[in-house]
Amino acid sequence: MFGPFKPAPHIAELPAEKIDSTYKRLRWQVFAGIFFGYAAYYFVRANFDLAQPGLIQAGLYSKAELGVIGSAAGLAYGLSKFVMAGMSDRSNPRVFLPFGLLLSGLCMTMMGLFPWATSGIAIMWVMIFLNGWFQGMGWPPCGRTMVHWWSKSERGTIVSIWNTAHNIGGMMPGAMVLLASAVFFSTHGIEAQAKDIWQQSLYYPGIAAMICAIPVY
């Protein structure tokens, strides 16, 4: 790997009396990073699904067209996990994880804020493909980090705890759509329909993901 993605340089070994306490503190600090970082990946993993009813209601796309567009996500994610796993093993996970999160959030933010990014099936397919590709940068550095910081006898427990990040992150886009509905109601005085907030379904989670990338780093 090159530039900031290169593995972190070796540092001098700590005095023996500091190793145990420092190790315990740092590995939970690292765990917090991969836990909340991976949870934030789920902000923009499937939030496009929440925007689809609005796109249909607004008459912009049909269900069949959105099905074609959505196929890009699974294709890209599968390919990316295969490719990015090898790259992650040769990189600095502190950079690799938040960088993918930042780019994934950027894709969704652009789709929500810039009309050109949702102006046609082809461009939307590309944007969803890119988002799926960047999503593949989430799991590999997390798995590698847990292997490095926890022994074999501890990994079952730590991976089980880490796995709850999926659930925490997965519930947030729905909460953000509710927030968008509340903002629309306070601004317009009427209840929001799906066609009124489909953009927010994309860029609210996108912006949140990009913000989360900062403390994760």
Predicted regions and their residues:
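Symmetry-related core transmembrane helices of the 12-TM Major Facilitator Superfamily/SLC fold
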Residues: 199-217
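Cytoplasmic helix-loop-helix junction between adjacent transmembrane helices
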Residues: 127-165
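Helix-to-loop junctions at the C-terminal end of transmembrane segments
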Residues: 80-93
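Extracytoplasmic
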Residues: 29-63
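C-terminal ends and interior cores of transmembrane alpha-helices
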Residues: 102-118
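Glycine-rich segments within core transmembrane alpha-helices of 12-TM secondary carriers
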Residues: 160-182
